[in-house]
Amino acid sequence: MERYVTIASCQLNQWAMDFEGNRLRIIDSIKEAKRQNASLRVGPELEVTGYGCEDHFLESDTYYHSWEMLCSIIHDPDCQDILLDIGMPVMHKAMRHNCRILALNGKILLIRPKIWLCDDGNFRESRWFTPWLRPRVVETHYLPTFVAKSLNQTTVPIGDAILQCNETVVGVETCEELFTPNSPHIDMALDGVEIFINASGSHHELRKLTTRVNLIQNATEKCGGIYLYSNQRGCDGGRLYYDGSSMIFANGKMLAQGHQFSLKDVEVISATVDVDTVRSYRFQPSHGIQGVTRPSYERIHVNFSLSSYQQDYDIYRKPTDPIEVTIPLPEEEITFGPACWLWDYLRRSHAAGFFLPLSGGLDSCSTAVLVYSMCRIVCKAMEEDDAQVLSDVRRIVGDPSYSSTDPKKLLNHLFYTAFMGSEHSSKETRSRAKELSSLIGSYHTDVNIDTMTSAVVKLFALVTGKTPQFRSNGGTNAENLALQNIQARSRMLLGYLFAQLLPWVRGYSGSLLVLGSSNVDECLRGYLTKYDCSSADINPIGGISKTDLKSFLRYAKEALDLPILQEFLDATPTAELEPTTESYVQSDEADMGMTYAELSVFGRLRKISKCGPYSMFTQLMHQWGDRLSPSQVAEKVKRFFHYYGINRHKMTTLTPSYHAETYGVDDNRYDLRQFLYPSWTWQNKKIDALASKFEQHQRK
């Protein structure tokens, strides 16, 4: 006997606190799921509110408006005759829960609270929600009065239960629960659950998709079953980009996969599966023996068939064939992820475009290429008749008839660049900036900042009677650093002025978002001036290492047809803030006292491996001991932590950056540390003592 069910998983570009917009996107996804003949629709985690509401989850208004939206959704005529799984926060016994609402034909069947909350990395769910730490316990939830009147329903079961439909059993697993060692799907599978639904609010990190795919594949390969994974997509108001990639697996095989990076506000994937194949897959006696020894879940009986055809054989349905999993290269992830994040931020901020100080170096070049990538993605969406994208483009450029799908033409409307040179700038950097801007089509300005910086120096001399000098002219380190910082900070001031007025110069309305271009390695080392060009509105590369940026530009050179990028890759990274002499040319790595490759290693050990100075030294002795002496390794570690400690305060004012990597330094909520450090005296003594032992052993 065959029992074909068609099931749908959604990825929605929700916006935190945009209740009306979120409701419309949810309804659109339900309509699309029905158009694909699905009888079950699963949406992202907390889709009614948007996942990123943060402390708004502590406000009673958030719960009130969520119920209003839910009533509107499940009463909608287009949302009937399909089993709905909708995510929203619910308050039960004065406790806030992250919940799934399972509803059918205007009635709520079950409220399933999240059992295991996510509290690592960027996640702080226990700050807002209480976990349902009572396996298989179900209580009665009394609906708010206005909801009870609207639905003609006073109570609903709340807790860890499963749905018994006419021909199959449905169980719920929410995001983090999949990642835990003892995931709920294990016990649910042993109790006969055949369809698992997982709503997620999982953000993008380079190479993270592989982890999700492996977990779902392994779960269904081991336990058998049909697994629907739904994820939010887009920038919902913060540093994170939720990268979709909704999936449907059956017995270890992928049947459908949503796009990871896309501008579509609503995307629905579906698959048709024979439930009997799950039962056949679970033939092992050990599966049954383990099942009968486990306590049972409470079953909520639902008189609804997920399979529309009730005879033994359905000649009108064909099961979905397995497909290959799509995993992008890290370079592709950098090309598309930050670009889509930039577009969401731009259209939702109602700005007129972006302004970027284009220095002619690799970092600002990377940011410019990401904006160009964004315009290519936008124009492709317009070619595919995406009405929402077209509407947003016309509003941003201020032309209700705009229809061009030329990325360079669009970029010229909304992207402004400026080379802010000084007497220390080289012809090469100025030329590279101009050529890149010409190649991608930005509105480019070339300005000299010497007038501004000399005015500040003259004012200081007038007040103090002393004129600071560069080190090459006999000045002290303090003078040398101050003169560099004046140049850097004047660029920030000038950048915001240009962002405010350049659209006016061209006869356009609105102002621009200022883009920053400091990479994660420089932020970690503190190799940036506080309140210079690193201070901006947003930074698309602030979570990406120099090493990954170089790989990205090598990829973009071919993929985006930008041969000029090779010149940026070949150039020596330099701030160009000091005079160049016959014996001295400023270099970033020389200034820092460490290479970008070394910084990347330090960053991974510090954050991912959770190493302090001493354990980092012991780790690096294994990695670098064959080419460096113990004292050299010790010196590098001590130097890194010295500069990390004295510059940590800069992270507290860091421009909001696209979160891209697990070694990020975002002080907002990802990398929480003090910003006033001691001198690591005890740690340094321990490192020196161990280095001495290593060297004594080597001399024997």
UniProtKB/Swiss-Prot annotation:
Top EC class, one word = ligase
Q: Can you name a GO cellular component term?
A: nucleus
**Alphabetically ordered keywords of this record:** ATP-binding, Ligase, NAD, Nucleotide-binding
GO molecular-function annotation terms? ATP binding; glutaminase activity; NAD+ synthase (glutamine-hydrolyzing) activity
InterPro entries assigned to the protein according to its UniProt record, in alphabetical order: C-N_Hydrolase, C-N_Hydrolase_sf, Gln-dep_NAD_synthase, NAD/GMP_synthase, NAD_synthase, Rossmann-like_a/b/a_fold
Question: SUPFAM superfamilies given for it?
Answer: Adenine nucleotide alpha hydrolases-like, Carbon-nitrogen hydrolase
Q: Which residues form the CN hydrolase domain?
A: 5-275
Q: Name one GO biological process term.
A: NAD biosynthetic process
Q: Which PROSITE patterns match?
A: CN_HYDROLASE
Q: Where is this region: Ligase?
A: 327-700
| Recorded catalytic activity of this chain's protein | deamido-NAD(+) + L-glutamine + ATP + H2O = L-glutamate + AMP + diphosphate + NAD(+) + H(+)
Q: In which pathway does it act?
A: Cofactor biosynthesis; NAD(+) biosynthesis; NAD(+) from deamido-NAD(+) (L-Gln route): step 1/1
Recorded E.C. number(s)?
6.3.5.1
Q: Active site at which residues? A: 45 (proton acceptor), 114 (for glutaminase activity), 175 (nucleophile), 359
Residues binding ATP: 357-364
Read off the HAMAP family from this record.
Answer: NadE_glutamine_dep
* Record family assignment: In the C-terminal section; belongs to the NAD synthetase family.
Q: From the Swiss-Prot or TrEMBL record, give the protein name.
A: Putative glutamine-dependent NAD(+) synthetase
> What organism is this sequence from?
Schizosaccharomyces pombe (strain 972 / ATCC 24843) (Fission yeast)
